[in-house]
Amino acid sequence: MRQRGFTLLEMMLILLLMGVSAGMVLLAFPASRDDSAAQTLARFEAQLRFVQQRGLQTGQFFGVSVHPDRWQFLVLEARDGADPAPADDGWSGYRWLPLRAGRVATSGSIAGGKLNLAFAQGEAWTPGDNPDVLIFPGGEMTPFRLTLGEAPGIAFNARGESLPEPQEAQ
């Protein structure tokens, strides 16, 4: 008589799907207003990793627009013929739009406006509508360091790797 049951491969696939589902659920929760700096930066890093992986899968360019009180992930889309490009736009034929990723949060905000973005080469940070950090389809990104108030920040190098020590991005 033949035994019936699940194979090891089927069990591993179920565990993988449960893990991915749990991760998506956690990213979909709205930000609580009393987050600590470490929690806020961890949420930003999780969103950044999600967008980085999405870029690897889809081949799209993404960006992050950082303001003192919030951040927003953006996607580079082709302009349609009815949408003229502004005269000072360096993205001829393309425009940055807020990223919509289903139920996954692609933005965040904090009370009090304490976010600070620093670049490896010492470039000045001027918050605006265009992205401050570019995320390329291969996973590379603009090197940066993000801090929240006086707490230690997070830093990433040009390869998109998190730097272990909170130091100037390389």
From Swiss-Prot:
Top-level taxonomic group: Bacteria
Keywords for this protein: Cell inner membrane, Cell membrane, Membrane, Methylation, Protein transport, Transmembrane, Transmembrane helix, Transport
InterPro entries associated with the record: N_methyl_site (IPR012902), Pilin-like (IPR045584), T2SS_protein-GspH (IPR002416), TypeII_GspH (IPR049875)
Propeptide: 1-5
Membrane topology, from the record: Single-pass membrane protein
Keyword Transmembrane assigned: yes
Keyword Lipid metabolism annotated: no
Membrane spanning residue stretches: 6-29
Gene3D superfamilies: minor pseudopilin epsh domain (3.55.40.10)
One Gene Ontology term, aspect cellular component: plasma membrane
Subcellular location: Cell inner membrane
GO biological process, one term: protein secretion by the type II secretion system
Residue positions, PTM N-methylphenylalanine: 6
Matching SUPFAM superfamilies: Pili subunits (SSF54523)
Post-translational modification: Cleaved by prepilin peptidase. Methylated by prepilin peptidase at the amino group of the N-terminal phenylalanine once the leader sequence is cleaved by prepilin peptidase.
Protein family per UniProt: Belongs to the GSP H family.
Quaternary context: Type II secretion is composed of four main components: the outer membrane complex, the inner membrane complex, the cytoplasmic secretion ATPase and the periplasm-spanning pseudopilus. Interacts with core component PulG.
Function: Component of the type II secretion system required for the energy-dependent secretion of extracellular factors such as proteases and toxins from the periplasm. Part of the pseudopilus tip complex that is critical for the recognition and binding of secretion substrates.
This protein's name: Type II secretion system protein H
Organism: Klebsiella pneumoniae
